[in-house]
């Protein structure tokens, strides 16, 4: 079953997030196992939510693409949940 990756990014701004996602958008759309990506402001920065086919695919994408693109000092707090159900339009 699919997984939900949640990342809290303390200190991240909308502008900082936008620069990162602009650089990664094309790649994530083609990433094995990627289903969807959403974001929202959080109390102390920015929150990112992604749905992936597996935790391994999410971790591989993060390690090879996201981590190297993050500004120095920005360290997301990532958590994973196995999803019971995903319904799309």
Whereabouts are the PLM-identified features?
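Short S/T/G/P-rich N-terminal loop/turn motif that feeds into the first structured element of a domain
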Residues: 1-49, 53-68, 74-89
């Amino acid at each position: 079953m699919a997984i939900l990756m949640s990342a809290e990014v303390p200190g991240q701004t909308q502008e900082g997030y936008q620069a990162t996602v602009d650089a990664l958008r094309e790649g994530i759309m083609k990433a094995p196992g990627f289903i969807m990506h959403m974001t929202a402001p959080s109390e102390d920065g920015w929150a990112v939510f992604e749905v992936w086919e597996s935790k391994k695919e999410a971790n591989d994408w993060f390690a090879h693409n996201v981590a190297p693109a993050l500004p120095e000092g920005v360290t997301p707090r990532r958590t994973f949940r196995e999803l019971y159900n995903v319904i799309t339009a």
